[in-house]
């Protein structure tokens, strides 16, 4: 699906760096790790998470198939598995380098991209030390629906998980969920802690019905109507609107709303790899944040809304000068 190239880098935003640091801190609070233990991060991206462990003397392995991220990942961990996850490839590294099985395995923000989630978890369980912990963080269905997060419905996301479905998958493959936390990452995520020792998974009350899905669709339509009405007003009144953050998930909204370069000319983006390219299906040119600020639009249309607090700090000068953020969801609003 990714053809060994992945656009997103974990270290681009301070919000995500802090979120990954929080996973490190949470792991330390469990007090089961010893210096020199092996840590494996599956879907390691640029190694932002593993860097925290490496600095404290743990042996770190990053599993990441995207070739464009390998150089940065190698700086932040001890060993790199440049392939899609499976136990066989990991075991080759363990044997070759005489490394113990991982005491901690993490899989952050990639559980919804799996073609075979059960096989993925089975291999992780096989790789995990008998006294180890597996931590997965992923967006949850309940918050996606509550927050009208249309962007989650994109080509990369093959699954949407309830707690019940997660518990089934982990238990089927010999892991029990002993702790679960919710946070605001990516609009709302579960952080799930599993091990082999517990007899049962904890219970979580979660209520998402078909009626909730129907209400979600209705709210999405209302957001769409309000948004398009406002963009039409901007065009009639010669107000310039740029996208802020040319995110993958944002393409779902752009295409569903039928927003193209006639309504929005440019998309401001921090990652240099995207500059000069165009948003898929909508044909909006992607430019750097620096270039976008020079053009000084009246409005920035925020795609990755989960980072809005960071964006407000970053664009303080522009906001004080009269700029406004457009938030398409959870509920359409103008922020100034």
Where are these regions (language model features)?
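Hydrophobic, well-ordered beta-alpha structural blocks that scaffold small-molecule cofactor pockets
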Residues: 26-27, 33, 52, 193, ...
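Class I SAM-dependent methyltransferase SAM/SAH-binding core
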Residues: 51-89, 266, 272-275
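Short amphipathic alpha-helix with an adjacent loop that forms part of the alpha/beta core around
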Residues: 88-100, 289-295
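A conserved beta-strand element that flanks and buttresses the S-adenosyl-L-methionine
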Residues: 103-106
């Amino acid at each position: 699906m990714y053809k060994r190239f992945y656009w997103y880098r974990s270290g681009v935003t301070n919000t995500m760096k802090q979120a990954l640091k929080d996973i490190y801190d949470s792991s330390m609070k469990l007090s089961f790790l010893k210096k020199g233990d092996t840590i494996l991060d599956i879907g390691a991206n640029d190694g932002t998470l593993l860097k925290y462990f490496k600095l404290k003397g743990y042996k770190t392995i990053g599993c990441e198939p995207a070739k464009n991220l390998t150089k940065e990942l190698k700086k932040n961990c001890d060993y790199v598995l440049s392939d899609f996850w499976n136990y066989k490839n990991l075991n080759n590294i363990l044997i070759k380098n005489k490394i113990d099985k991982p005491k901690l395995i993490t899989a952050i923000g990639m559980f919804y991209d799996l073609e075979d989630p059960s096989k993925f978890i089975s291999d992780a369980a096989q790789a995990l030390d008998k006294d180890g912990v597996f931590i997965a963080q992923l967006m949850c269905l309940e918050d996606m629906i509550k927050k009208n997060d249309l962007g989650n419905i994109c080509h990369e996301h093959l699954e949407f998980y309830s707690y019940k479905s997660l518990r089934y998958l982990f238990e089927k493959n010999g892991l029990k969920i002993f702790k679960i936390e919710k946070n605001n990452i990516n609009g709302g995520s579960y952080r799930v802690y599993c091990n082999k020792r517990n007899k049962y998974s904890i219970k979580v009350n979660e209520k998402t019905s078909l009626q909730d899905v129907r209400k979600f669709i209705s709210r999405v339509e209302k957001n769409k109507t309000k948004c398009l009405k406002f963009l039409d007003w901007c065009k009639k009144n010669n107000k310039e609107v740029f996208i802020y953050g040319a995110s993958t998930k944002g393409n779902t909204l752009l295409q569903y709303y039928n927003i193209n370069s006639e309504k929005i000319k440019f998309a401001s983006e921090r990652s240099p790899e995207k500059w000069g390219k165009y948003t898929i299906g909508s044909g909006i040119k992607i430019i750097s944040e620096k270039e976008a600020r020079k053009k000084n639009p009246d409005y920035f249309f925020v795609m990755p809304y989960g980072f809005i607090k960071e964006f407000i700090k970053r664009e303080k000068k522009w906001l004080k000068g009269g700029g406004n953020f457009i938030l398409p969801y959870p509920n359409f609003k103008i922020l100034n």
